[in-house]
Amino acid sequence: MKLQLVAVGTKMPDWVQTGFTDYLRRFPKDMPFELLEIPAGKRGKNADIKRILEREGEQMLAAVGKGNRIVTLDIPGTRWETPQLAQQLERWKQDGRDVSLLIGGPEGLAPECKAAAEQSWSLSPLTLPHPLVRVLVAESLYRAWSITTNHPYHRE
């Protein structure tokens, strides 16, 4: 199974790149994790936000591999505690399909992305900066993997 993070935004601060890459390199070869960045639509005073969101959504869905399970990152999604996420990761592995996790831009996810999703995951009831979400998702999935393989990274 391959994990794919599809995120709006291409110009991340160095700390995001450093943090995300640190977890990315830890994933085992049998569970590769990749990042696909979608350029954010140009926002300005007179921008058509609805159209920008629609375009970003189209690009996100086009980046998702055929047959992939789509999981959106969204506040109203399901909140998993770490052991529950580990169980979810095991179910995804048993399913045999690759998993695409979608992170929207400043206005969130396009309705088309939400409609295409099989699951929605909420990291927190707080609104989090999208760059930070990349690092949190990578760390959370790595921690979940460590639980499923009895790796010493996670401690109770």
From Swiss-Prot:
Its EC number is 2.1.1.177. Pfam families: SPOUT_MTase. One of its GO terms (molecular function) is rRNA (pseudouridine-N3-)-methyltransferase activity. It is found in: Cytoplasm. It comes from the Bacteria. Belongs to the RNA methyltransferase RlmH family. Specifically methylates the pseudouridine at position 1915 (m3Psi1915) in 23S rRNA. PANTHER family: METHYLTRANSFERASE, RIBOSOMAL RNA LARGE SUBUNIT METHYLTRANSFERASE H. This is Ribosomal RNA large subunit methyltransferase H. It comes from Pectobacterium carotovorum subsp. carotovorum (strain PC1).
